[in-house]
Amino acid sequence: MSGRERNGGRSAENNDKKERNERNGRNDRGGRNDRRNQQDERSQFIERVVTINRVSKVVKGGRRFSFTALVIVGDGQGMVGVGYGKAKEVPAAIQKGAEEARKNFFRVPMINGTITHPVQGEDAAGIVMMKPAAPGTGVIAGGAVRPVLECAGVQDILSKSLGSDNAINIVHATVAGLKQLVRPEEVAARRGKSLDEVAPAAMLRARAAGQGA
């Protein structure tokens, strides 16, 4: 057999192997493409790290240190979640927090880039008040409230923290408030009235224009 024939046979075998790997979800080196798919999935979300703390645990041999991370993940289109990760290294703690946040996703009802009605969220000593705002107002929020609203995709809102300054309490109070939001249709159905009787005219116009989330 000539060298050209041997090279041709190897090329055909390599092509067949490559096709099999593609069908089985593997790359040319035999590894799966799951890692690449996970990176693409993560790039679709907005991640914000609110706090990173170092904690210690007293054991028989002394103290054992680890890190905790409070992470907020959202798609910027109404979905948001909060996660808390703990690990021996900071990157691992952030990764665990982001994974937990994606598991805790919930949808925030919005119309024209703002929330549907005023709401007040409370968790432990944290109290956060949020009100709808006109287009162009922006996100009027500070501290740990802002990253939650930005990851959720809220564009215009008025907010104020009335309780504890602890970032964890503020984040959970903000999430508790956002989970209290309801759509105008739900309020109308609950009261047995039409949507026009419940929702303001500006909200109805924005909803008719397809600006609700």
From Swiss-Prot:
Enumerate the UniProt keywords alphabetically.
Ribonucleoprotein, Ribosomal protein, RNA-binding, rRNA-binding
UniProt-listed Pfam families: Ribosomal_S5, Ribosomal_S5_C
**In its keyword annotation, does this UniProt entry include Methyltransferase?**
no
Q: Specify the protein name.
A: Small ribosomal subunit protein uS5
The cross-references to SUPFAM superfamilies, in alphabetical order and at most eight, read:
dsRNA-binding domain-like, Ribosomal protein S5 domain 2-like
InterPro entries for the chain: Ribosomal_Su5_D2-typ_SF, Ribosomal_uS5, Ribosomal_uS5_bac-type, Ribosomal_uS5_C, Ribosomal_uS5_N, Ribosomal_uS5_N_CS, Ribsml_uS5_D2-typ_fold_subgr
Query: What segment(s) does the record annotate as region Disordered?
Result: 1-41
Q: What is one term from the GO cellular component aspect held by the record?
A: small ribosomal subunit
Job of this protein: With S4 and S12 plays an important role in translational accuracy.
Q: Where is the S5 DRBM domain?
A: 45-108
| Record gene name | rpsE
Mind listing the GO biological process terms from this record?
translation
* Subunit: Part of the 30S ribosomal subunit. Contacts proteins S4 and S8.
**Organism field:** Corynebacterium jeikeium (strain K411)
In the UniProt record, does the keyword Ribosomal protein occur? yes
About its domains, the entry says: The N-terminal domain interacts with the head of the 30S subunit; the C-terminal domain interacts with the body and contacts protein S4. The interaction surface between S4 and S5 is involved in control of translational fidelity.
User: GO MF annotations for this entry?
Assistant: rRNA binding; structural constituent of ribosome
Which family does this protein fall into? Belongs to the universal ribosomal protein uS5 family.
Alphabetical list of PROSITE patterns matching this protein: RIBOSOMAL_S5 (PS00585), S5_DSRBD (PS50881)
